[in-house]
Amino acid sequence: MNYHELISRAIDIQAHIRALEEEFPELVAIDTNSIQIEWDAFSALFPNDVHMEKHFIHEGYEHKRGWYNGAYIVTCREVKPDEA
């Protein structure tokens, strides 16, 4: 994939996430330096199209990471002691 294709995909995913923020403001928050997606909403907002690369617990946080339409998506949540 060349540079222009990557930029195009990045613009597409940005538009997709902005649309999700408008439709589901309680689940998606975009600020200057980050995009936050509610943990339970991650799979619902990005079904089947997310190719999970990693799912792990580190320093009290559970992380999910994967690719969606050429963009790398990350979400995490604090793990309660009874879940660890």
Regions found by a protein language model. Give the residues of each.
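Short intrinsically disordered terminal tails
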Residues: 1-2, 78-84
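Cysteine-centric segments in proteins
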Residues: 22, 73, 77-79
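Acidic, low-complexity, intrinsically disordered interaction modules
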Residues: 27-72
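Contiguous, amphipathic alpha-helical segments that mediate oligomerization or scaffolding
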Residues: 1-34
